[in-house]
């Protein structure tokens, strides 16, 4: 599962030849955030809710509602490839630095409400991921496309 900022056609090409290492090429892609297989896409809806909660804003919308599937990728790519709405990227990028700790804490609270108590050893990587998502969106703001690629 990856978030990638750059030209959608280049992202699809990289995925079609299964060369995700190319996402780290800054000449081709503005930003890349590998989310790994341990993160469920619905967790990003809870992340969006955490952003709204700590900022007191109505944005971003849930991540599910901020995605639109790219047409014509099913025959070339084994993943679901979706464009992420610019407003979602900009709303997350606008989270002030002094709220990162609160954002991570709120995300963990929401995850625990949904899944039950998380093991203590899971929380540090979730806190880290919250910060990495904000950093990614700041780099991705203004990119031609922001793509979410994931598999079942």
Each language-model region and where it sits:
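Acidic (Asp/Glu-rich) sequence patches and key acidic residues
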Residues: 1-135, 139-143, 151
């Amino acid at each position: 599962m990856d978030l990638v900022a750059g030209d959608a056609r280049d992202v699809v090409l990289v995925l079609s030849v299964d060369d995700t290492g190319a996402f780290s090429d800054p000449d081709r892609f503005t930003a890349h955030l590998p989310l790994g297989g341990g993160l469920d896409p619905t967790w990003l809806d809870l992340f969006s809710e955490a952003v709204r909660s700590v900022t007191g804003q109505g944005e971003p919308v849930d991540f599910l509602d901020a995605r639109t599937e790219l047409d014509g990728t099913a025959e070339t790519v084994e993943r679901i490839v979706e464009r992420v709405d610019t407003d979602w990227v900009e709303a997350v990028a606008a989270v002030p630095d002094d709220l990162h700790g609160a954002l991570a804490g709120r995300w963990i609270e929401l995850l625990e409400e949904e899944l039950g108590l998380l093991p203590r050893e899971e929380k540090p990587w979730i806190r880290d991921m919250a910060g990495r998502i904000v950093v990614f969106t700041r780099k991705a703001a203004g990119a031609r496309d922001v793509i979410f690629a994931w598999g079942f």
